[in-house]
Regions:
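Extreme N-terminal starter segment of soluble prokaryotic enzymes
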Residues: 1-4
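Active-site metal-binding loops of divalent metal-dependent hydrolases
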Residues: 7-9
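Conserved N-terminal subdomain of the carbohydrate kinase-like
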Residues: 11-23, 40-121, 135-140
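Short catalytic helix/loop segments, enriched in acidic residues and glycine
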Residues: 19-34
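Short secondary-structure boundary/capping elements
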Residues: 24-28, 101-106, 125-129, 152-155
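Conserved beta-alpha-beta core of the PfkB/ribokinase-like small-molecule kinase fold
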Residues: 119-180
Length: 180
């Protein structure tokens, strides 16, 4: 496996100065994997979804060459949900709702084929989960990228700082950088 992305596959409500979209497919892992599909042929995704997540969206990922063996489906539960409002400059946002749902008890188990990935993208998850994923790798990837947000800085800063010591690249906006 060349690239493994671990993160959220979710539903989002997004409000911008130009409009609003409700219950759209969201999540960092969703869009990281879709974007990477233009450049990487051998990639996998690790996440958890509820029974409410549309199967056709998983099929779409597979059609893009994204291996979805690492997506756990909890049929009786709801998928992660995030709602946010972006401001005029699109860098500043307010988190309105974070419903962890299936993510609340997510314990990712990397498929064996994923554990030797050359590149690892740790999406927006709890720092404890991010650390657990790092510890599941057979060897340190060539590059480890981490995404996080204000929510985790607010409730799990010590864990986040520990994970930061084991990554190469951090992707946050200017507001999050000031908060960190």
């Amino acid at each position: 496996m060349k690239l493994v992305t671990v993160g959220t596959v979710a539903f989002d409500d997004i409000e911008t100065p130009r409009g609003r979209a409700e219950m759209v497919i969201g999540g960092a892992a969703t869009y990281i994997s879709r974007s990477a599909s233009f450049f990487v042929e051998n990639q996998g995704i690790v996440s958890v979804i509820g029974g409410d997540f549309p199967e056709d969206e998983l099929e779409e990922m597979r059609s893009l060459g994204i291996n979805t063996d690492g997506i756990e489906i909890k049929k009786e539960e709801k998928s992660f949900f995030w709602a946010g409002r972006y401001h005029d400059n699109m860098n500043k946002r307010d988190t309105l709702i974070t419903d962890l749902n299936v993510l609340a008890n997510f314990e990712p188990k990397l498929p064996e084929a994923y554990r030797s990935a050359e590149y690892l993208m740790l999406g927006n998850l709890t720092p404890d989960i991010q650390m657990d994923v790092l510890n599941q790798m057979h060897k340190r990837p060539k590059l480890v990228v981490l995404d996080t947000m204000n929510f985790w800085m607010d409730i799990a800063l010590d864990g986040l700082v520990a994970v930061l010591k084991r990554i190469d690249v951090l992707t946050i906006n200017d507001e999050e950088a000031r908060q960190l």
